[in-house]
Swiss-Prot record:
This is Phosphomethylpyrimidine synthase. Catalyzes the synthesis of the hydroxymethylpyrimidine phosphate (HMP-P) moiety of thiamine from aminoimidazole ribotide (AIR) in a radical S-adenosyl-L-methionine (SAM)-dependent reaction. The gene is thiC. Keywords: 4Fe-4S, Iron, Iron-sulfur, Lyase, Metal-binding, S-adenosyl-L-methionine, Thiamine biosynthesis, Zinc. InterPro entries: ThiC (IPR037509), ThiC-associated_dom (IPR025747), ThiC/Bza_core_dom (IPR038521), ThiC/BzaA/B (IPR002817). The lineage of its organism: Bacteria, Pseudomonadati, Pseudomonadota, Gammaproteobacteria, Pseudomonadales. Its EC number is 4.1.99.17. GO terms for cellular component: cytosol. It catalyses: 5-amino-1-(5-phospho-beta-D-ribosyl)imidazole + S-adenosyl-L-methionine = 4-amino-2-methyl-5-(phosphooxymethyl)pyrimidine + CO + 5'-deoxyadenosine + formate + L-methionine + 3 H(+). It comes from the Bacteria. The keyword Zinc applies. GO terms for biological process: thiamine biosynthetic process; thiamine diphosphate biosynthetic process. It comes from Pseudomonas fluorescens (strain ATCC BAA-477 / NRRL B-23932 / Pf-5).
């Protein structure tokens, strides 16, 4: 997966899937839950657990169902060929609605130019359909359907997906314990229904990013009353990285749990790279269109025009991009407010638009043409991700006048988008110390009327280059608890360089931890099922189950094997931290056995006496380390 473009043969003939991304997870199987029609098949991952040994034969542990973003890549029954892309999930749903039309060809000038260039043949994805667009006068957004009282197939799909077979889990006893959460005003029901999904989308509190030209998509939902989602970034740059490498990063990222992926490519062949990514992506793809627009004017921000940007939006919408980051809130009057900052404007998109505004001394053309942008968005059902171009790039600049001024403008733009029934989420910081994070969330809810919040971290301190996945993971967990709907991952390479596959995985796992911690704290129904199952496996020394229930089984198994590499250690009733004689869980088990043998009903027996007797018994039995399984 490391062949550079200059050495590439025809990608439509040579491209191969990243083999690491298609390996099934140990003791896991892909399962599908069918909806009201045969073609609504919602994927989940089911983890099979070992039997707990008992004196009477064994206790069966029910399988645990977990959310699965990996798409068909981890289904052994699906043949993956990245040259042809993934299978079609949504075309029948879209056609049945009867409000779209198939175009005769691409309608963007740039798209037509790229298609006509014979030099690009060897790089081009070969199996591209003509795009769809809304019929004249039609609005094909999920918000428009929701406000008309229509429950779409996409809405039913995400309702099934969010529940993760919760009723079956309760019946199997997997949720005997779950702490009450504190949701800070979120309205999370005990069960997610299609009607609840429709209501949340109609209200603007949630979005389903689902471009009608991204038919390979497995729909998902972003909103404060649903599971906290994470986004992973990929994309080439002028410094290198091939199309195959970016597709490999995509498949690798979704394997580990990236709910959406943003293609932030800024180098050559942006158009072709994006086509390969979308055709092979089961998750929503987001972009920052101003990056490509800037490439078209050779990096000179002053030369950007509305007409060129409009063509870029149509080009990307016809490829199937699900959400656009658009920095329409960077207004001319806000730019001087950044002069006194420690780190000024750190957003690439924000700095591009600030430079354009100052060069022309005119208002941001993304702001002045916002209604026209909405017309494009609703013709393809592209969601807004309103960019925070003035986000703080250091904790010193957090919550300043420029940041919150822009946020108020984003609230104004949100209401304009909603008048067009266009789905919308709001991007947030950035670098914010812990004590100022809740103010960010509260102000966003107030200004943007509960539109989903999507933040980059935030990083809670600036002193740890190389560890900013940790500095930001702390802030991400906090703001996710307070109500943030999606967290944009940060890798260890943040501020330092382009992430490789290992960095991508580290960033995603860090953010899956933050998102899950937030779900637990909010009291999301069923959030504690996996924790309970892993804790039980840990107490019962079911090592393989501990590995397989974890977010990263490979690393857990590797760390265990560094100290205890033999297979016999997988049935040991101790770990390398405490050893056999000092394992608290082993001692607790023996105390419980003692209590049961003495017919003491309460577990709070004379612990000192119990421990002394068990210690003597351990010595008399020859300090036996293992129990037969």
């Amino acid at each position: 997966m490391t062949t550079k473009l200059k050495n590439a043969s025809n990608l439509s003939e040579s491209a191969q899937v990243d083999q690491q991304s298609v390996q099934p997870f140990t003791r896991s199987q892909k399962v599908y839950v069918q909806g009201s029609r045969p073609d609504i098949r919602v994927p989940m991952r089911e983890i099979t657990l070992d039997v707990t040994p008992t004196d009477f034969g064994g206790e069966i542990n029910a399988p645990v169902t977990v959310y699965d973003t990996s798409g068909p890549y981890t289904d052994p029954n699906v043949v993956i060929d990245v040259r042809k892309g993934l299978g079609d999930v949504r075309s029948a749903w879209i056609e049945d609605r009867g409000d779209t039309e198939r175009l005769a060809g691409l309608s963007s000038n740039f798209g037509q130019q790229r298609l006509a260039d014979p030099e690009l043949t060897k790089l081009r994805f070969a199996h591209v359909n003509n795009p769809r667009r809304a019929k004249a006068g039609a609005n094909v957004s999920q918000m428009h359907y929701a406000r008309k009282g229509i429950i779409t197939a996409e809405m039913e799909y995400v309702a099934i997906r969010e529940n993760m077979k919760l009723q079956e889990a309760r019946a199997a006893g997997l949720l005997k314990q779950q702490h009450a959460g504190h949701s800070f005003g979120a309205s999370i029901p005990k069960e997610i229904t299609p009607e609840f999904v429709r209501e949340e989308i109609a209200r603007g509190r949630a979005i389903i990013p689902a471009n009608i030209n991204h038919v390979e998509l497995e729909p998902m939902i972003i909103g404060r009353n649903f599971l906290v989602k994470i986004n992973g970034n990929i994309g080439n740059s002028a410094l290198g990285s091939s199309i195959e490498e970016e597709v490999a990063k995509l498949t690798w990222g979704i394997r580990w749990g990236s709910d959406t992926v943003m293609d932030l490519s800024t180098g050559k062949h942006i158009h072709e790279t994006r086509e390969w990514i979308i055709r092979n992506s089961p998750v929503p793809i987001g972009t920052v269109p101003i990056y490509q627009a800037l490439e078209k004017v050779n990096g000179v921000a002053e030369d950007l025009t509305w007409e060129l940007f409009r063509d870029t939006l149509i080009e990307q919408a016809e490829q199937g991009v699900d959400y656009f980051t658009i920095h329409a809130g960077v207004l001319l009057r806000y730019v001087p407010l950044t002069a006194k900052r420690v780190t000024g404007i750190v957003s690439r998109g924000g700095s591009i638009m600030a430079k354009w505004c100052l060069a022309h001394h005119k208002e941001n053309f993304l702001y002045t043409h916002f209604d026209e942008i909405c017309e494009i968005m609703k013709a393809y059902d592209v969601s807004f991700s309103l960019g925070d171009g003035l986000r703080p790039g250091s904790i010193a600049d957090a919550n300043d006048e420029a940041q919150f001024g822009e946020l108020e403008t984003l609230g104004e733009l949100t209401k304009i988008a909603w008048k067009h029934d266009v789905q919308c989420m709001i991007e947030g910081p950035g670098h914010v110390p812990m004590q100022l994070i809740k103010e960010n969330m509260d102000k966003q809810l107030e200004c943007c009327d509960e539109a989903p919040f999507y933040t980059l971290g935030p990083l809670t301190t600036d002193i740890a280059p190389g560890y900013d996945h940790i500095t930001s993971g702390i802030g991400a967990a906090m703001i996710g608890w307070f109500g943030c709907a999606m967290l944009c991952y940060v890798t260890p390479k943040e501020h330092l360089g382009l992430p490789n596959k290992d960095d991508v995985k580290t960033g995603i796992i860090t953010y899956k931890i933050a998102a899950h911690a937030a779900d637990l704290a909010k009291g999301h129904p069923g959030a504690q099922i996996r924790d309970n199952a892993l804790s039980k496996a840990r107490f019962e020394f079911r090592w393989e189950d501990q590995f397989n229930l974890g977010l990263d089984p490979d690393t857990a198994r590797s760390y265990h094997d560094e100290t205890l590499p033999k297979d016999s250690a997988k049935v040991a009733h101790f770990c390398s931290m405490c050893g056999p004689k000092f394992c608290s869980m082993k001692i607790t088990q023996e105390v419980r056995e003692y209590a049961a043998n003495q017919r003491i009903e309460a577990v709070d027996v004379d612990v000192a006496k119990g421990l002394a007797e068990q210690a003597e018994r351990f010595k008399q039995e020859g300090s036996q380390l293992y129990k037969k399984v």
